[in-house]
UniProtKB/Swiss-Prot annotation:
Keywords: Allosteric enzyme, Amino-acid biosynthesis, Aromatic amino acid biosynthesis, Lyase, Phenylalanine biosynthesis. Both domains are absolutely required for activity. In the absence of the ACT domain, the enzyme not only loses its regulatory activity, but also its catalytic activity. Optimum pH is 6-7. It catalyses: prephenate + H(+) = 3-phenylpyruvate + CO2 + H2O. Allosterically regulated by all of the three aromatic amino acids (phenylalanine, tyrosine and tryptophan). Inhibited by low concentrations of aromatic amino acids and highly activated at higher concentrations. Ionic interactions are required for optimal activity. It comes from Mycobacterium tuberculosis (strain ATCC 25618 / H37Rv). This is Prephenate dehydratase. Optimum temperature is 37-42 degrees Celsius. Residues 3-189 form the Prephenate dehydratase domain. Homodimer.
Length: 321
């Protein structure tokens, strides 16, 4: 049985993302009847369970369209024993503002919210519950639990969590931006990446020596090969003030020749490169990397001992005429 830790408790958007991954066949060697879901209190705890051997995979949020990257996930991937991403899925996210049955907005003095969720409904709360004292929650489901336990008057949560805790909605479909989406990833211990699909993402963490032009030179290795970078983000190393790691996402797979060549070149330039994986994205995340080019075919002919193709210059053609 495959054990998957996820940001819990039951009823989170992360659980919904995990259900979608399983249904889409993105979880290796499993099916609905061969899966043990393990809710934990945070994304770092889910990743720690994989590192410790308590889980085979972790399903965690990594990015949302309103507040950007989920920093606890990024930081946990950058440090400790290396882990690898094997799959992703994206959910359209809207929230419910919930209370105990029989309560209304006038009763709300305190409100629990997962910080990522609070950022996505900030304007709505300011307009409709401006006097509510915001209390942090470990997850959207934990926010609902706090209402059920009488710790707060209301919560920002998922419809699934609201139903599981028997809560009433003051408002459904709440989100400041109508196109709010959150991306979730499936993370496990290092292994062979999923097969190239032609719609893939590759991610790495770069540790670059503090020298003039070093970052530009590293990133140029992708640009000169026609590789589409979809995310560049810095995070502190946590070892010395003013030193940073750089998260880089690109379109393509490690089995794409252009991506492989770029990774090799970056490895030569950087103090360290942590490969986070290559995995399918479903819809293409950007411009696909170029296929094998003429220079590669030329090199392959040389290695095989085949004769070189003779190039005919326009001047030569005129002379022959």
């Amino acid at each position: 049985m495959v054990r998957i830790a996820y940001l819990g408790p039951e009823g989170t958007f992360t659980e919904a993302a995990l259900v979608r991954m399983v249904a889409a066949g993105l979880v290796p060697e499993t099916g609905p009847d061969a899966l043990q879901r393990m809710p934990v209190e945070s994304a770092p705890a889910a990743l720690a369970a994989v590192r410790d051997g308590g889980a085979d995979y972790a399903c965690v949020p990594i990015e949302n369209s309103i507040d950007g990257s989920v920093l606890p996930t990024l930081d946990s991937l950058a440090i400790g024993v290396r882990l690898q991403v094997f799959a992703e899925t994206t959910l359209d996210v809207t929230f419910s503002i919930v209370v105990k049955p029989g309560r209304n907005a006038a009763d709300v003095r305190t409100l629990a919210a997962f910080p990522v969720a609070a950022a996505q409904v900030r304007q709505w709360l300011a307009a409709h519950l401006p006097a509510a004292d915001l209390r942090p929650a470990y997850s959207n489901a934990d926010a609902a639990r706090q209402v059920a336990d009488g710790l707060v008057d209301a919560a920002v949560t998922s419809p699934l969590a609201a139903a599981r805790w028997g809560l009433a909605a003051l408002a459904d479909g709440v989100v400041d931006e109508s196109n709010a989406r959150t991306r979730f990833v499936l993370v496990g211990r290092p292994g062979p990446p999923p097969a190239r699909t032609g719609a893939d993402r590759t991610s790495a963490v770069l540790r670059i020596d503090n020298q003039p032009g070093a970052l530009v030179a590293a990133l140029a290795e992708f640009g000169i090969r026609g590789i589409d970078l979809t995310r560049i983000e810095s995070r502190p190393t946590r070892t010395e003030l003013g030193t940073y790691l750089f998260f880089v996402d690109c379109v393509g797979h490690i089995d794409d020749e252009a991506v492989a060549e770029a990774l090799k070149a970056v490895h030569r330039r950087c103090a360290d490169v942590r490969y986070l994986g290559s995995w399918p994205t479903g819809p293409a995340a950007g411009a696909q990397p170029p296929l094998v080019d003429e220079a590669s075919r030329w090199l392959a002919r040389l290695r095989a001992g085949k004769p070189e193709q003779t190039l005919v210059r326009p001047d030569d053609q005129g002379a022959q005429a």
